[in-house]
Amino acid sequence: MEPIQGVVLGIIQGLTEFLPVSSSGHLVLVQHLFGITEPALFFDVSLHMGTLLAVLIVFRKDLGMMAVSVGRGIVAMFGGIAPRSDRDAEGLKLALLIVVGSVPTAILGLGLKQVDHLFFSLPLVGAMLLVTGTLLWLTRDRDTGGVGVSGFSKGRAFWIGMVQGLAVLPGISRSGATIAAGLFLGLDRATAARFSFLLCIPAIVGAELLSAVDLFSGHARLDLATVLGSLTAFVVGYGALKVLIRIVQQGRFYLFAPYCFILGGVTLWIGMR
């Protein structure tokens, strides 16, 4: 792979991993239009590591808070001491919600992955992009109300995790579906976006660990295209994530819907020719 190809794929990965337009849907469409074969596993894993790093940096304060809170909670459990502050209580609850949401994601995601070769057809991708667009469009009616972490129930976390598992289907945007689900379930905008991206961390790590098993059984080669692609995915992904969080908080999440409708329609047309 040429270095410029690595950069281009890094840009696509960085943008579509976080913006609610479906990274898998774009991958299938680009491969079909340009006759590109699936990227080497090591290159694909490297791109995802770049976008994962972007999430870790953007949400480093939340991750640090949860780590400290869980640590203090463990000490308190054995020492019979209650958590020290409201911040500890919030960190413990947020960590628990992520665990609850990750369980259905893992079960449903792993189940669908066993038959994912059946899903990568252009008509299906087009139809799922239309579904994504519809979900995004419906969020325009969500006002600024809703609950934060304090009112966030485990049931809500479970259903958002289910939605994330379904995002294995190409054309369904993970961020779009989970943020929309959070809004529909009564979360406020900031909490819906915050939980969506925190919930994606164990999902990405789990998927990459599974890929690493195959990776180490093959031949991995670090070249310039891989390095540039990973760095590009990180930089572009960081910027895309910051922009998307601001858009969600401003109540303009639905603005991505027309793009999904147009791309979904074009994909359906190409797939059924």
UniProtKB/Swiss-Prot annotation:
GO biological process: cell wall organization; peptidoglycan biosynthetic process; regulation of cell shape; response to antibiotic
Record bears the keyword Transcription regulation: no
Annotated TM spans: 1-21, 39-59, 63-83, 92-112, 118-138, 165-185, 195-215, 225-245, 252-272
UniProt-listed InterPro entries: UppP
Cellular compartments per GO CC: plasma membrane
Gene Ontology molecular functions: undecaprenyl-diphosphatase activity
Reaction(s) catalysed (UniProt annotation): di-trans,octa-cis-undecaprenyl diphosphate + H2O = di-trans,octa-cis-undecaprenyl phosphate + phosphate + H(+)
Origin superkingdom: Bacteria
Membrane topology annotation: Multi-pass membrane protein
Keywords: Antibiotic resistance, Cell inner membrane, Cell membrane, Cell shape, Cell wall biogenesis/degradation, Hydrolase, Membrane, Peptidoglycan synthesis, Transmembrane, Transmembrane helix
Major subcellular location class: membrane
Main EC class the enzyme belongs to: hydrolase
Pfam families tied to this protein: BacA
Keyword hit for Ribonucleoprotein: no
E.C. number: 3.6.1.27
Compartment(s) of residence: Cell inner membrane
PANTHER family: UNDECAPRENYL-DIPHOSPHATASE (PTHR30622:SF2)
Role this protein plays: Catalyzes the dephosphorylation of undecaprenyl diphosphate (UPP). Confers resistance to bacitracin.
HAMAP family named in the record: Undec_diphosphatase
Further information: Bacitracin is thought to be involved in the inhibition of peptidoglycan synthesis by sequestering undecaprenyl diphosphate, thereby reducing the pool of lipid carrier available.
Family: Belongs to the UppP family.
Protein's UniProt name: Undecaprenyl-diphosphatase
Gene this chain is encoded by: uppP
